[in-house]
Amino acid sequence: MRLSPDTVAAERDWVRDRTPVVTLINDVRSDLGATFGVEVAPVSEADYRAEVDAVFADGDLAVNVAALVALLRDLDVEDDYPGFVVDELLGRELAGMIAGTQPLRLLGEATFHYADVSHHPEAEREGGAEPAEPAGVDDLEAALAAGFQTRLPGWDWTDGDSPFAVE
């Protein structure tokens, strides 16, 4: 793999245009909100795109996010199962990277596993048709959903200053 500013821009454009991820973000937010008994604000496509732009505006973060996106977009292992650990590892890392610094990073990583388990695009194919995309793409979508849902506003506990800040 060769990364350049043009490659990073191309991966940003792919992520930015992957707006069906917004549905997964909102499904995850709704499920987690119900689990924890809280209301979580939904995310719009405009919110998602703006946050993608924010992630890719940080060059050091952008090149690493772009590398993981490119790897997952192309990852396909014959019979898939042997590649299960690889796509989980890359997806978890991508979700954490997008989510931000601790504790958001850990929440993004944990949320990746939830999003991944609940996201089954292969089940949506008709008549057992072959997948249109490599196996890593569903993990990529779960990682994008987990990372961006974690970093975007909408969770009450992230509004305002922490009560644990010491002045």
Across the structure, where does each feature detected by a protein language model lie?
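Glycine-rich, aromatic-bearing surface loops/beta-hairpins
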Residues: 111-167
